[in-house]
């Protein structure tokens, strides 16, 4: 197990434990964004922010696919992802945000969203993350799809060449935190929802990475192993 995967699994376990023992932390976090009888997200600018965080990961995936295709058709972009990298990006998006989060948890874990609970003028009583008997029937609070998709941005950042990778990784984590914060502010999710949504995707990213690059290398279409690029040693 690599260090990143160990850290993500450990953080997920800690989050599950902390919010199981002290579920009131979720309510306290939601109350921070609840003012004048409602949450944020009621004006056009705030709704634009939600759409931005929701759409951008898919735009990035399409852009990477376009670069990959352009390279295959004879164009010469400065950089393009390898076929292996495209499999990595598609697989992590489908498995993490797609199958596990949206088709798995959100449609089968019946936790009401903050905006749907009685503590915030909704119809349903609050339930902690581990209680699957809440009043929500579908597209529920646990876990956050937007947080999951937001932290997926770590995947495309991680396959960039070394000069771009570090700042892109910082931007990717900032994007994930921004998407999560917005969902909290809108009353769409509790803190445990966004933490676990993001961590599930990060765990999936690391597992799929180990499957596709079992020796830990990352390739680009020019045939270089990025982990050895400083030595200018082409793969044979």
Task: Go through the PLM ranges and name each one.
Residues 1-67, 104-114, 118, 122-125, ...:
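N-terminal transmembrane-helix/juxtamembrane module of multi-pass inner/ER membrane proteins
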Residues 35-43, 64-80, 216-223:
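Membrane interface segments of multi-pass transport proteins and intramembrane proteases
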Residues 10, 14, 57, 61, ...:
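Hydrophobic, lipid-facing residues on alpha-helical transmembrane segments of integral membrane proteins
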Residues 21-22, 65-78, 158-164, 207-212:
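Structural signal for the C-terminal ends of transmembrane alpha-helices
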Residues 1, 39-40, 78-82, 128, ...:
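Helix-boundary and loop/linker segments of multi-pass membrane transporters
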Residues 2-12, 126-236:
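Membrane-embedded catalytic cores of phosphoryl/pyrophosphoryl-handling enzymes
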Residues 15-20, 94-99, 174-184:
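Aromatic-anchored segments of alpha-helical transmembrane domains
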């Amino acid at each position: 197990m690599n260090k990143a995967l160990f850290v993500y699994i450990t953080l997920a376990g800690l989050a599950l434990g902390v919010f199981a023992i002290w579920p009131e932390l979720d309510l306290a976090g939601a109350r921070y964004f609840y003012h004048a009888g409602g949450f944020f997200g009621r004006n056009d600018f705030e709704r634009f922010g939600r759409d931005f965080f929701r759409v951008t990961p898919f735009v990035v995936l399409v852009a990477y696919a376009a670069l990959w295709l352009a390279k295959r058709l004879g164009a010469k972009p400065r950089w393009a992802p390898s076929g292996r990298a495209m499999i990595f990006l598609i697989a992590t998006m489908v498995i993490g945000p797609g199958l596990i989060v949206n088709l798995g948890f959100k449609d089968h874990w019946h936790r009401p969203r903050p905006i749907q609970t009685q503590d915030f003028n909704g119809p349903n009583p609050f339930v902690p993350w581990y209680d699957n008997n809440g009043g929500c029937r579908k597209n529920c609070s646990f876990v956050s799809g937007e947080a999951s998709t937001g932290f997926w941005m770590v995947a495309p950042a991680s396959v960039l060449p070394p000069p771009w990778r570090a700042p892109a990784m910082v931007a990717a984590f900032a994007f994930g935190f921004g998407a999560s914060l917005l969902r909290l502010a809108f009353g769409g999710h509790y803190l445990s929802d966004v933490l676990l949504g993001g961590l599930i995707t990060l765990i999936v990213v690391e597992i799929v990475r180990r499957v596709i690059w079992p020796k830990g290398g990352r390739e680009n279409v020019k045939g270089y192993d990025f982990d050895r690029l400083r030595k200018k040693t082409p793969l044979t």
